[in-house]
Amino acid sequence: MGVTYLTSWSDQEQYNVVQEMEPLMWRRNIQRMKAHGFSGVISSAHDINTIRKWGDEDHELLNVCPGITVETPYGEPFHSGQVRTTSPKEAQDLGADYIVIGRAITESDNPVETAIKLKEEICKTEMNTSKE
């Protein structure tokens, strides 16, 4: 698995570290991943269309997406330092093959309740998808 850039980085932070404009960075990294036999890419779900546009048009690479969040009991998203986050449903709608859920559970006020809520959301999304 290859990593594009961290979900905790903003676009400006990514540029400050990599010092390349996005299209060039995407194309170069995706070409390297394919050349070295990587089976997938770890990225924000928001990057999936860009990854496909700039080098994975044939969808050879699996998309594994961290930065999955859930609403807090107060209706606000739980980010825990992540800048580019999505809900499980949004990640699926954007084309994620797999999602990674960590801090949204482990750093919540009630990890069990949060895990149950996420499971329900994921199952509901899967059921809606299977009906189509």
Positions of predicted regions on the chain:
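Generic secondary-structure signature for well-ordered alpha-helical cores
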Residues: 31, 35, 53-56, 97, ...
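A general structural detector for well-ordered alpha-helical segments in enzyme core domains, enriched
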Residues: 29, 47, 51, 87, ...
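C-terminal helical cap(s) of enzyme catalytic domains, especially alpha/beta-barrels
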Residues: 92-94, 105-132
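Catalytic cores of alpha/beta
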Residues: 72-97, 113-118
